Amino acid sequence: MESFVAMKVVCILFLFVVAAEAASTKESPAVNPSKGKDRIKFNFPRYVPNHHVFASNLLKLCTEYTPETQARNDGSQATYKPRINDLQVNFKNCTFLCKREFGNVTLNLPVDTPCGPNKQTCADKSKCVGHIPGC
C-alpha cells in the first residue's frame, strides 16, 4: 500500500514537471500522452475526454494567473513552480486549486469543461454534478 502511494506521488510529480515544461513552450500547451507503459492515471471523471490535456490546460491557467495584489518579481528566479492536484478539481462548482508560491488560490474551470455525464459544461454550473472517484 505504501509503495502504491509513493508511486502515485512520483507519477504526479512527473506529470507536473512534464506539464510545466509543455505549458512553457509556445507551440503547444498540452502534454502528449505517453506512448509507453508508464502512463499517468488521473482521478478525473470519465466524461473528461483527455485527462493529460485537461491537466496541462489547468496547469497553464495556474501558471498564467497573476493576482492584482501580488508584487512583481524583482528579477530573481524563483524555484517554486505553480502546481495543481487532480484531487482538488471540483466539477460541481467548476473550480480547481492552484498551488502558488505566495499562497493557494481557487480558480474557475474553463466554461467548456465537461461537468457531468450528460454533456453538461461549466457554462451552466447549476446543471453540474459532483464527481465520485471510482464511478
Curated annotation (Swiss-Prot):
Residues linked to a glycan: N93, N104
Gene induction: By feeding.
Tagged with keyword Glycoprotein: yes
Keyword Signal on entry: yes
Main localisation: secreted
Annotated compartments: Secreted
One Pfam family, short name: Salp15
Summary of the tissues where the protein is detected: Expressed in salivary glands from feeding female ticks. Highly expressed 4 days after start of feeding.
Keywords carried by this UniProt record: Glycoprotein, Secreted, Signal
Signal peptide positions (record): 1-22
Any one GO cellular component localisation term in the record: extracellular region
InterPro entries per UniProt: Salp15
Region (CD4-binding): 116-135
Family designation: Belongs to the salp15 family.
Reported function: Salivary tick protein that downregulates host immune system by binding to both dendritic cells, and CD4(+) T cells. Specifically binds to the CD4 coreceptor on T cells. This interaction prevents the activation of the Src kinase, Lck, and its downstream substrate Zap-70, and results in deficient activation of PLCgamma1, the repression of calcium fluxes triggered by T-cell antigen receptor (TCR) ligation, and a subsequent reduction in interleukin-2 production.
Subunit structure: Interacts with host CD4. Interacts with host DC-SIGN (CD209).
Protein name: Salivary protein 15 Iper-1
